[in-house]
């Protein structure tokens, strides 16, 4: 006696159900999107480091979420055309994520800073202040960099780095580390404002795949490779 297999019912989402779903989740989705928009809009290192870190976490999570969604589309493709596009998008997303990790690891080897895994930029400005290396991300490699000291507080490109410094502590060179090379900036102008404030302008002087000798005497290390990063 042969048995007949009953096909599984195909569930279709009606327009009324879609409208009901949007009505139920519209408020929550709006709050989430507003939160992400505010973080992406105002997340800058010169404004709030805490907000900027949250922004970096959101950007970093975009890659695995994208890969998960593209794989999901491959498994539940509507037809062969959708399947083909989903496979291509999955491969592209995975390759780009691998490239990101490779570049980040190369930059980490050069700088020793966890800022190397910043998903927004591969440019890290480095300044050696009395043997302590400060590393912070910048969007692009500018032709000039400005270092400011206001009553002992150290700022570089508007980003606060530390306290307890004077103009005499500023180095002759600062660097911007990239994945494949290092940019050296030479101090071209120094101006003192009052007793404890002033600024210095550094101009790009060299670009190449080399390392700048450390200002620490007897350390034998390179400026862009010091491990005591802040």
From Swiss-Prot:
GO terms for cellular component: host cell Golgi membrane; membrane; viral envelope; virion membrane. It is a multi-pass membrane protein. GO terms for molecular function: structural constituent of virion. CDD domains: HCoV-like_M. Pfam families: CoV_M (PF01635). Residues 1-24, 77-84 are virion surface. InterPro entries: M_CoV, M_HCoV-like. Residues 46-55, 106-228 are intravirion. It comes from the Viruses. The keyword Secreted does not apply. The chain crosses the membrane at residues 25-45, 56-76, 85-105. Keywords: Glycoprotein, Host Golgi apparatus, Host membrane, Host-virus interaction, Membrane, Transmembrane, Transmembrane helix, Viral envelope protein, Viral immunoevasion, Viral matrix protein, Virion. It is found in: Virion membrane; Host Golgi apparatus membrane. HAMAP family: BETA_CORONA_M. Belongs to the betacoronaviruses M protein family. Homomultimer. Interacts with envelope E protein in the budding compartment of the host cell, which is located between endoplasmic reticulum and the Golgi complex. Forms a complex with HE and S proteins. Interacts with nucleocapsid N protein. This interaction probably participates in RNA packaging into the virus. Component of the viral envelope that plays a central role in virus morphogenesis and assembly via its interactions with other viral proteins. This is Membrane protein. The gene is M.
